[in-house]
């Protein structure tokens, strides 16, 4: 028997440079080319490893944004035996970190957990035991929900720096804004496909890091993330079982057939 024809156009977008800094090969470059050509993506299924314990047990319909910064707290270098002649940036940073850690940035909402602030790296000192350093460098990150925005987070953070009368330098990098798919149609089709293939209904959880789904929001696309287990992501020997891939293939196939019949 002949295979049914598709009543929609199907495209597969592959990134060759997900983790790298250069622009070539990133999904946002592809999306820009699509938009320049007048193309529009109605529905986008992102194969991000969303599943927790079983394939398809969790889907994501949004993600928090990511705002990173590198802060240099400036002091005055000198000998540890002459405290009156030094300004120790480690001491001043300790007070700063304590205050930043105590801030409730927002309360989150029904779709997202509250905005979180984390410090990922701290570097200071010469390696000598008798020298007070002249600078402390701290790298940090906000994972922010739709209750906060870039300007609010920067303003609040730098207000603490000024309140403590610190001399500092700071660089900010916004790597992604929050996004949320609020239309129900595509979500319902994916939920039904998971139930049809696996027998269980997925939960919706918008936690985790950023994903390439954020690049599609400029098109107004309906975006849902559904992929393999995330147990080993970014670990040594990262892997996906062939059985899980087969289940995922079944869900994807069911979804394509379901969309074609509707």
PLM features per residue range, with description:
Residues 49-54, 61, 67-262:
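Metal-dependent amide/peptide-bond hydrolase catalytic core
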């Amino acid at each position: 028997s002949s295979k049914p024809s598709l009543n929609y156009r199907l495209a597969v977008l592959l990134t060759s440079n997900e983790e790298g800094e250069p622009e070539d090969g990133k999904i946002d470059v592809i999306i820009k080319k699509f938009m320049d050509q007048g193309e529009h993506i109605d529905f986008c299924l992102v194969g991000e490893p969303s599943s927790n314990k079983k394939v398809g047990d969790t889907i994501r319909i949004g993600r928090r944004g990511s705002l990173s910064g590198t802060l240099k707290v400036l002091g005055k270098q000198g000998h540890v035996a002459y405290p009156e002649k030094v300004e120790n940036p480690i001491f001043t940073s300790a007070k700063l970190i304590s205050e930043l850690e105590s801030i409730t940035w927002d309360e989150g909402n029904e779709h997202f957990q509250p905005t979180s602030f984390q410090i990922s790296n701290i570097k200071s000192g010469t390696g000598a035991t008798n020298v007070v350093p002249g600078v402390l460098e701290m790298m940090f990150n906000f994972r922010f929900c739709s209750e906060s925005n870039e300007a609010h987070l920067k303003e609040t953070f730098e207000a603490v720096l000024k309140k403590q009368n610190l001399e500092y330098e700071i660089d900010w990098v916004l790597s992604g804004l929050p996004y949320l798919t609020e239309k129900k149609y595509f979500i319902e089709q994916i939920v039904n496909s998971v139930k049809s293939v696996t027998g269980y209904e997925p939960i919706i959880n918008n936690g985790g890091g950023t994903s390439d789904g954020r690049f599609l929001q400029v098109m107004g696309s309906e975006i849902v993330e559904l992929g393999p287990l995330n147990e080993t992501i970014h670990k040594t020997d990262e892997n996906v079982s062939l059985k899980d891939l087969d289940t995922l293939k079944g869900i994807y196939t069911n979804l394509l057939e379901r969309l074609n019949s509707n």
